[in-house]
Amino acid sequence: MTIPATYAAIITAAGRGTRAGDGPPKQWRPLAGQSVLERSIAAFAGFPRVVVTLAPEDMARGVAELSGPVVLVAGGATRSDSVRAALESLEGSGVTHVLIHDGARPLVSRRVIGGVIEALQSGAPAAAPALPVTDALWRAQDGCVTATASREGLFRAQTPQGFALDAILAAHRAHPEGAADDVELAIRAGLPVTVTPGDEDNLKLTWPGDFARAERILGDAMDIRLGNGFDVHAFTTGDHVWLCGVKIPHDKALLGHSDADVGMHALTDAIYGALAQGDIGRHFPPSDPQWKGAESHIFLRHAAMLARQMGYEISNADVTLICERPKVGPHAGAMALRLSEIIGVEPDRVSVKATTSERLGFTGREEGIASIATATLVKG
């Protein structure tokens, strides 16, 4: 999931959550080692701006306990008042779109967030995740069923709900009386709202039993995989090398069946390794002439796509290049950016660095370049 630079997230956490039982407000309660609010904020890692609304009496606590690049805004008397204050804090900031999320939904996945972003990027002025109603619906009075109701066309709303900033801010200002959620205000303002896929695990913590369910989900969901990759290519005659997708002038080239991008090959194998899916040679055999001279981004894209097909998100990639020359440092930023584009993650989740072997071995004799890579995958 790539997050546009002009997108921001708003996380609402100014409510008191009295239905969740006695104790502190639910957003401050612990959930598997972190507060509910910390988990909700972490779900939006990589957003250029994250605005969190808090009750005025919680502002000092927010400053003390919430880490990361978040902006705190004092909430109002109602949820709508709080959201409007957060929206107004983004005016004139260059933000074009905003995703508004309930702070009491700490288990929202990158897949759900990505679905909203994709709809907005496709031109929808508003988009929100939801799940179709599958249970039978009844009407009841005094503890007795009085009628049934059709569930056709009914959905259970979730967050984050995404909007063009100007449009949703205008809707809030035009309807200060508020609404159940921001989609309701958007509909009143005449904005079409696209429904995107929701997730059963994206529950809103409302009742005491919801916390136990969330703990169970987290216990089942912590599927983290690490993969390592290693590759070596010898030097040959030439005037440039490809390293992590960047063409670097050099007095030699790297020898290989494809474009010999040693860094990209190591990262590709790291992803395959984390998935227990072999290596590049298994998926793109060097005996197959169609891969002669192929650009290595083809291999890396395939590995990233396979990860997503198997239900994993790439959380982090770390590549180390081992060589005396060429000097990698001046190009490391461009390399990390190129790799992030190929595997579909934020640039700050990719690291490219270099070291030497202190003139020892084949890299020390400048006979070639080696690379080591590590990839971290998390079940989405």
UniProtKB/Swiss-Prot annotation:
Its cofactor is a divalent metal cation. It holds the Pfam family IspD. Bifunctional enzyme that catalyzes the formation of 4-diphosphocytidyl-2-C-methyl-D-erythritol from CTP and 2-C-methyl-D-erythritol 4-phosphate (MEP) (IspD), and catalyzes the conversion of 4-diphosphocytidyl-2-C-methyl-D-erythritol 2-phosphate (CDP-ME2P) to 2-C-methyl-D-erythritol 2,4-cyclodiphosphate (ME-CPP) with a corresponding release of cytidine 5-monophosphate (CMP) (IspF). Residues 1-224 are annotated as: 2-C-methyl-D-erythritol 4-phosphate cytidylyltransferase. It catalyses: 2-C-methyl-D-erythritol 4-phosphate + CTP + H(+) = 4-CDP-2-C-methyl-D-erythritol + diphosphate; 4-CDP-2-C-methyl-D-erythritol 2-phosphate = 2-C-methyl-D-erythritol 2,4-cyclic diphosphate + CMP. This is Bifunctional enzyme IspD/IspF. InterPro entries: IspD, IspD/F, IspD/TarI, ISPD_synthase_CS, MECDP_synthase, MECDP_synthase_CS, MECDP_synthase_sf, Nucleotide-diphossugar_trans. GO terms for molecular function: 2-C-methyl-D-erythritol 2,4-cyclodiphosphate synthase activity; 2-C-methyl-D-erythritol 4-phosphate cytidylyltransferase activity; metal ion binding. 4-CDP-2-C-methyl-D-erythritol 2-phosphate binds at residues 231-233, 257-258, 279-281, 355-358, 362, 365. Residues 225-380 are annotated as: 2-C-methyl-D-erythritol 2,4-cyclodiphosphate synthase. One of its GO terms (biological process) is terpenoid biosynthetic process. Disulfide bonds: none annotated. Transmembrane segments: none annotated. In the N-terminal section; belongs to the IspD/TarI cytidylyltransferase family. IspD subfamily. In the C-terminal section; belongs to the IspF family. It comes from Paracoccus denitrificans (strain Pd 1222). The lineage of its organism: Bacteria, Pseudomonadati, Pseudomonadota, Alphaproteobacteria, Rhodobacterales. A divalent metal cation binds at residues 231, 233, 265. The record marks 19, 26, 257, 356 as: Transition state stabilizer. Signal peptide: none annotated.
